[in-house]
Amino acid sequence: MSGKDQSREITIVGGTYRETCYWPVWDELYGSGWRAVRVIRAFFPDVKIKFHTAGGSDVKQLLKVYAASEKLEYEVTELPDTISFYYNHPLSSPIMHGCPSTMVDMNASGQYVVGFGMLEAQTMINGDWVVYDPQSPRNPLSFREQGGKAAHLALVLNETEARKLSGEMELDAVKTALFEREQCECLIVKCGAKGALVYTSKDDDGKVIPVFKSSHVFPIGSGDVFTTVFAHCWFCGNKPTDAALIASKAAAAYCEERGIVDNIPEQVKDNGYKEHTPLKKGLVYLAGPFFTLDEKLFVSECRNMLQGMGAQVFSPYHDVGEGKAEDVVPKDIEKLRACACVFAIVDGLDSGTLFEVGFAVALGKKVVAYVENETEGALKMLEGTGCDIEKDFTTAVYKTCWYAAE
């Protein structure tokens, strides 16, 4: 990093929420705001932090204990209960509990401010250098319409938030509307597995910032890490594109480690992650049994998650259906020949699925085999023929989408 003094004071505004995931198991008190505090502390230990958040008694106790040993000032707007999010898996839409019926007002000011949209509060931010992430695909709130003031404003949004906030659909129109309405000098639109686009003016065509591949993917909170690291790097005088590149590597390190650990800054500096550069939109063949209700539900979940990541998916269950072998098999084989890669549900060692895997391997296709319960011996042929064997569902989905785009 370069430029200004890195031991500055940063004000962070954002939620502190309970996050519970059933598979893989995750039960932590985090949320965007508190995660940002932890990220700043891990990456930039000399920075003083002022933290504005809201929550119940558990949040107050957490911050009291943490502040006793760290450079942290905090202010908690008290709520009856801390908001909780429950995920079936990291790619699923969470169920939310504890959100108050009315929003509270929160004010925060400072020379350098990282602000996250909050479910329970409208935040009015006043700062010289401000990074704002609305954090709400359903109802993103405008920085300026909340009364926010900033001499230098950067917006970080995903595609859905950018379209909702701007009222436009095409990215060129989105960009123009947000620069004009929000009076920002930098706009970052996160595009999932395709990376992010960084704009520095409404006439800018945008610079693509790649996603970096990790061997394990735990995405809950990765967007918070990206925004926070980008903010500090930008505050330090880095160009927006350079700051976003560092932030993308930091997000990959977080996904790899499944949390904020001491060695994340070293991982980012070592630059051990490969860029994912989408070159095409290849077809994913979804192989798996669909004889019982639970099998049909899981095949549908896999299809939905892959499509949600932007993949084109052929599913024999959804696209051909059940029928006589002479009717369905030729159609399946045709798509196996045409696909870029295969996502295979291997638990249960279904004979049809194993045939599809073997056929794909013989054709030189990439195969990601998602399996939780089978023995190493049962998977020997898959392992020996170069299939990616994954026990983590989210990682399997990400790897499949990466292969499909190569």
Question: Which residues are covered by each model-predicted region?
Answer:
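Conserved N-terminal subdomain of the carbohydrate kinase-like
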Residues: 3-12, 16-27, 37-129, 272-278
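Conserved phosphate-binding/catalytic region of the ribokinase-like
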Residues: 3-8, 173-281
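Charged C-terminal helix
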Residues: 65-80, 252-308, 316-321
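Short acidic-hydrophobic, aromatic-tinged amphipathic segments that line or gate anion-handling sites
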Residues: 74-78, 385-400
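Conserved phosphate/ATP/ADP-binding segment of small-molecule kinases
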Residues: 134-206
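Short, glycine/polar-rich helix-capping loops at beta-to-alpha or helix-loop-helix junctions
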Residues: 140-147, 372-384
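TIR-domain catalytic/interaction hotspot
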Residues: 321-344, 352-356
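Amphipathic helical hotspot of TIR/SEFIR-family domains
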Residues: 348-369
